[in-house]
Amino acid sequence: MTYVRAFEHTSQVLEHNPMGDPHVRQVHVYLPPDYSERRKEPYPVVFMLAGWGGRGATYLADAGAFAQGLPQRLDRMIAARELPPCIVVFPDGSTRLGASQYVNSIANGNHMDYLCDELVDWVDERFHTHKSRDYRGIIGHSSGGFGALVCAMMRSDRFGALTSSAGDSWYEFLYTHTIPQTLEALRAAGGVKSFVDQFLASPNPMGLLGGRAIVAMLNLSMASCFTPNLEVPVIKGDLWFDLETGELIDEHWKRLLAWDPLRMVDRHVSDLRSLRFIQLESGSEDEYGLHLGHRQIAKKLQRHGIPLHIDEYPGKHSGHHHRMPLRIARMVKHLVES
């Protein structure tokens, strides 16, 4: 029987954040069938991170008449012994502008500390876990994949396994090829403030406003994550491109590039080598070039002698959440190996 519980968690590190986002957030937790505090062997834990514009509960949405949802798939795989019993945690890393990218920011608050310290400890206190990073993995798609990559690198004391599904990387392409669309959207709206106001006033901006508006808001939100500046109104961050010409602004561009997982690999070799499992998956036609980012990350890992599982499958950036249970299973099997 599927057992997903919803909790409200009060964060200390997110309280009074300059963006004004809530510090009381919902956390959903999947517990395996027959979960028991008296079980001899504690349960491994997987933290599952949503992409930009989503929350953890996004993964728990009803899959419709012709597909099983994620919790039901996990139940079925556990019953078939295809997946060791495990706990899966779905945190909320969203912000007013879309996403925190799960990093610490003077604008959005310390979301990495929230996830890696507050939530990890909260889960270990509340549930029957190993209370060890060696039995704790992190997985996510898109911005969630980025979050998994950077948390595993920067907080390898907390996570022993990593899965990135089309995680943000190779910023030279990812954060330049949408600059023209962003400028068009901002110009049509009458500037940054007007654009943000119109976007947030829409009852369903992701569905009604179109791709140009979405990539524009995504780029604006990245400034609050990676190039924060509290003196900048509305977005509280410095954009890395000129709003008139689109040319890169060197100072801000360098700050953004420092957060590219592709560049971070060389700074975190020992952290990555300590992980029990690394998995990179993506569609072979990802329109954001993230399959190429993964290939470049894999090449660096291989150069450092760090083992990994990398896979590409037919498809673009979206529409592949049905692969998540298999990724979780592959990760958890490595976590429970002695």
Tell where the protein language model's regions lie, with residue ranges.
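Non-catalytic cap/lid and distal C-terminal segments of serine-dependent acyl enzymes
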Residues: 1-338
